[in-house]
């Protein structure tokens, strides 16, 4: 899941985010070519620092290199919208840690993406935080206030959902588009009075004069906040063994957390730049999905034929409807999100 988004046509084109598409860091690791990666060329994998979650274990422990071999390049992005240009260009065949709105924005512009791994559902690690000094007592109280978020990220959907339920017209709210690091700074300087954000910034705000007004546990499962991993459909269909190895590497991170929890907390804390205590709190705020969970009705569906009725596909549709109503995207909601969800690489 990331920090503030303006609700009016913030991601009407992928090109709008070109200015923030530069990755923060690139890690290149060469490994012996595996059967999966032969003829696939150099493989780029994008990811975000979402705090403590199993995918950061896969990055830190080099599971992608172990499973995929060959030349794997890891690119760190500040947010999902920041990765859109790379995804749209086809230069980034895999991306992890995305919220649904950036994926929807890309798909709406014709980028051939499929969700191939649903990492986790947010329950307590993302939401709406207000300053205790702001006087904001309810979602309706955001009227006339400055709210920070990452435009085009999951935060847009969350805020739109909270506002709709509270009867709040978002045109009455001053929305400030910031990256997660900028949001943290804006909070400290008093530029914003509230924010919709995810970990690790979410925890920072709560512990620095903030109060949780709403969290993602208030969202229904069919319209909830997930961290998801996507693959370029064209690339994955040409190199299915690579896609399966990508999913396997993500599963390795989940298994490490399940089997070596104490060590895993240390790995996640170091990789995310947080304390072990914070990592422990953050990981408790997720419902985490393993590889075996993927091909189930609640996650990606049992097959391509049933993916449209899966929890992930239904949440994609509900996110899409909310973003369309809010004017964040201009492409109408499709009848089915089944074509954008693929459980087969997890089998």
List PLM regions with ranges.
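Short, low-complexity disordered leader/linker segments with a strong preference
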Residues: 1-42, 347
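Conserved C-terminal helix/tail region of periplasmic/extracytoplasmic solute-binding proteins
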Residues: 316-347
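Short, glycine-/small- and polar/acidic-enriched structural segments
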Residues: 33-169, 174-177, 193
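Solvent-exposed, polar/charged alpha-helical surfaces in well-ordered, non-transmembrane soluble domains
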Residues: 62, 66, 85, 89, ...
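Secondary-structure end/capping motifs
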Residues: 238-326
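Pocket-lining segment of extracytoplasmic ligand-binding domains
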Residues: 101, 176, 181-272
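Short, surface-exposed acidic
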Residues: 170-173, 273-284, 329-337
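Sec/Tat-exported extracytoplasmic proteins
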Residues: 67-68, 91, 96-99, 107, ...
């Amino acid at each position: 899941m990331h920090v503030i988004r303006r609700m009016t046509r913030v991601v009407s084109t992928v090109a709008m985010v070109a200015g923030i598409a530069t990755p923060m860091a690139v890690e290149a690791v060469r490994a012996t070519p595996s059967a999966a990666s032969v003829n696939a060329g150099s493989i780029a994998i994008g990811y975000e620092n979402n705090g403590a979650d199993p995918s950061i274990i896969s990055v830190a422990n080099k599971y992608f290199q172990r499973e995929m071999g060959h030349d794997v390049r890891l690119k760190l992005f500040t947010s999902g919208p920041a990765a859109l240009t790379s995804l749209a260009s086809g230069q980034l065949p895999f991306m992890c840690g995305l919220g649904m709105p950036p994926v929807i924005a890309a798909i709406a512009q014709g980028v051939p993406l499929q969700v191939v791994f649903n990492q986790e559902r947010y329950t307590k690690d993302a939401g709406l935080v207000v300053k205790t000094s702001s006087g904001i007592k309810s979602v309706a109280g955001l009227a006339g206030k400055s709210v920070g978020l990452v435009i085009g990220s999951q935060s847009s959907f969350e805020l739109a959902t909270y506002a709709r339920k509270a009867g709040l017209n978002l045109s009455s709210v001053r929305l400030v588009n910031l990256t997660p690091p900028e949001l943290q700074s804006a909070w400290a300087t008093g530029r914003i009075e509230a924010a919709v954000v995810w970990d690790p910034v979410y925890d920072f705000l709560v512990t620095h004069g903030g109060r949780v007004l709403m969290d993602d546990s208030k969202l229904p499962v069919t319209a909830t906040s997930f961290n998801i991993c996507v693959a370029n459909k064209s690339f994955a269909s040409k190199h299915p063994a690579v896609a399966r190895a990508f999913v396997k590497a993500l599963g390795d991170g989940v298994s490490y957390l399940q089997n070596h929890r104490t060590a895993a907390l240390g790995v996640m804390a170091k990789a995310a730049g947080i304390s072990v205590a914070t990592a422990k709190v953050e990981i408790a705020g997720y419902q985490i999905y393993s590889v075996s969970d993927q091909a189930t009705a609640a996650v990606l569906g049992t097959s391509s034929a049933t993916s449209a009725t899966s929890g992930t596909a239904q949440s994609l549709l509900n996110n899409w409807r909310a973003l369309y109503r809010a004017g964040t995207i201009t492409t109408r909601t499709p009848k089915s999100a089944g074509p954008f969800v693929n459980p087969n690489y997890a089998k």
